Amino acid sequence: MGEMEQLKQEAEQLKKQIADARKACADITLAELVSGLEVVGRVQMRTRRTLRGHLAKIYAMHWATDSKLLVSASQDGKLIVWDTYTTNKVHAIPLRSSWVMTCAYAPSGNFVACGGLDNMCSIYSLKSREGNVKVSRELSAHTGYLSCCRFLDDNNIVTSSGDTTCALWDIETGQQKTVFVGHTGDCMSLAVSPDYKLFISGACDASAKLWDVREGTCRQTFTGHESDINAICFFPNGEAICTGSDDASCRLFDLRADQELTAYSHESIICGITSVAFSLSGRLLFAGYDDFNCNVWDSLKCERVGVLSGHDNRVSCLGVTADGMAVATGSWDSFLKIWN
């Protein structure tokens, strides 16, 4: 038996010991805990607005903290900031590269960012003195595509990349402050904790990792998926995370219990998940799928309680407003829909 084989066996034994130790700490399952709860009634949501203006597939969207404006990025090479109350376009920003994969709205509302196959994160100032929108920074150091970006504040942004790393940037200097190394596959998505001190990443190595922004270290790793993790989000209280994967399941992991609590899947669902988001209370989980639908799950009872159908192509992105009053879905059919 080669040295490599021996080490592999040792690693597997250690993994098993860790799994057993976690199980020993689990005093109750989620199913047992919520056995007395009724399933949420049928969730029926209507399309309240359809945002028309993109001319090609929409790849990403992100709500502003005011729950009114949102930014979307499309293969047509445009970044559009929408007023969702009126469906008007507040800004239509032409991009230098049309191969965009992600976009983000700064918490302050002063900036938006985007990036993709150009390996860069471009920051746009919405509040320039001249009134026009212009590139204020181009952050380039990643050696792979930019899959996701999220602002911490007006001067700090976190990015995830196909080069397997995540990075924290100082926007003012354009430099990487910290590089987060640990994934062994393309990093596909990230989400920032409600207190902005931690972030989570999901990758093609089928694992999710929790990172400490200030320390630059990986605090926890969550495994269980059988394929790429495409989407990830925090539970509203910041104490659990949800992942969506190409294995057709979403999974809920508890940070304090350090393990998976449950999975959301159904034998009739055989396609991958592109996006995930919780309702404000956390009771509902919205998940966008390759089959053109967005399924609504009761996060505690793990049952499907609704479906948002109306798109004519893959639902590529979705998001719930900060005030919890609406959910937006974006699709390869070039439209965004606002539901409640």
Swiss-Prot record:
The keyword Repeat applies. Signal peptide: none annotated. CDD domains: WD40 (cd00200). One of its GO terms (molecular function) is signaling receptor complex adaptor activity. The keyword RNA-binding does not apply. GO terms for cellular component: cell body; cytoplasm; dendrite; heterotrimeric G-protein complex. WD repeats lie at residues 53-83, 95-125, 141-170, 182-212, 224-254, 268-298, 310-340. Expressed at a high level in the heart and at a much lower level in the brain. It holds the Pfam family WD40_Gbeta. Keywords: Repeat, Transducer, WD repeat. One of its GO terms (biological process) is regulation of fat cell differentiation. G proteins are composed of 3 units, alpha, beta and gamma. Interacts with RASD2. Belongs to the WD repeat G protein beta family. Guanine nucleotide-binding proteins (G proteins) are involved as a modulator or transducer in various transmembrane signaling systems. The beta and gamma chains are required for the GTPase activity, for replacement of GDP by GTP, and for G protein-effector interaction. This is Guanine nucleotide-binding protein G(I)/G(S)/G(T) subunit beta-3. It comes from Rattus norvegicus (Rat). The gene is Gnb3.
